[in-house]
């Protein structure tokens, strides 16, 4: 089938601002956004975008489709769609700088305590451990745009680690210093999460309960 789309193009070395470039390509029925990008790339190899697993498991292909974050490999392509980068610093075209966002996600501390998590510990952690670090939630977080809030995926990670009996640190105190109480509970991070992680209710509100 034939699809006409618009794709954001931006090269910081030559452009002062992004522009939407129109393309019409042939793709198979049921094609995903990533298939459209591949088709455009076959015609113009200078188009920059990321992809890896092509199965919705790595998060590397996250972009905005008609203004909303989505994984390019799982989002169905549609005629007239507009494909743009996430609201993160743009390296080129649809490629964004993920380093600062991913490097700020808290990691569990090394523990020589010999503690083995029980099944109930694992069950409590499960709703928070499916994150694929696509940073879609970071892209839409209004609090991050106006404060020093470290972001929803960082809070999700803090709560996940706080629930781990092997963790020796005070994760609630860390979360407070990272802007825990600046979250507005707008739920936008939950709505755009490709893994449907309920970060506001399962992480941020829980951390606030412990803090109080």
PLM-predicted stretches and their roles:
Residues 1-96, 142, 147:
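Iron-sulfur-associated redox domains of electron-transfer enzymes in respiratory
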Residues 31-43, 87-88, 94-129, 133-212:
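Ferredoxin-type iron-sulfur electron-transfer modules in oxidoreductases and energy-metabolism complexes
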